[in-house]
Amino acid sequence: MNTHEEVMLWHALYQLETRYWHEVDANGGRNAHEFYLPDGLMVVGHNRFQGRDKIKEFYTWRERQAVTAISSVKTTRHLINNLFVESSGDSAARVLGIVSFYGAVVRAPAPQSKPPMLIADLMNDCVLDADSGWQFKSHTLQPIFMSHEAPPSIAIDTRR
């Protein structure tokens, strides 16, 4: 892979990641499941959501919590840093990076001087689909630092 191809791949996968988090932050993740392959996997800590239906179900639950729960996160921002992209073939790539998650229990603008709720390692396997473009085969957040306030994706216990 030459330098131009590496830059184009990095840009395409950076755009996939930023569009995904924009969907989550600006639209509550209502269409976040569409960023995944039909059998795609979303992992946050110990929670696993396999397939678009389960991913959509999580974001529906998350949005409902923001509306109905008194102390639930209502304003979020996900910041992406140190994105590293590695091609693993013509139509597959691995993405590594860091996601910092900020959340507040009030609507924006939220007065906040607290540190992020979560800083996690990001590990994605991405696949290029001829019709849909780049999609997540798997999208994993492995918590590294957490505040005492757990983000919704960690607070839910899918093991019960």
Language-model features: where?
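Short, low-complexity N-terminal intrinsically disordered segments enriched in polar/charged residues
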Residues: M1-A26, R30, E34-F35
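Short beta-strand segments enriched in hydrophobic/aromatic residues
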Residues: V24, Y36-L37, F101-G103, T140-P143
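A solvent-exposed, acidic/Ser-Thr-rich amphipathic alpha-helical stretch
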Residues: G29-Y102
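Short Gly/Pro-enriched turn/cap motifs at secondary-structure boundaries
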Residues: V73-T75, K114-M117
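Short beta-strand edge/turn micro-motifs at domain boundaries
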Residues: A92-L96, M117-A155
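Beta-strand elements of well-folded, non-transmembrane domains
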Residues: F101-R107, C126-L128
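Extracellular loop and loop/strand-boundary signature of outer-membrane beta-barrel proteins
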Residues: A110-P111
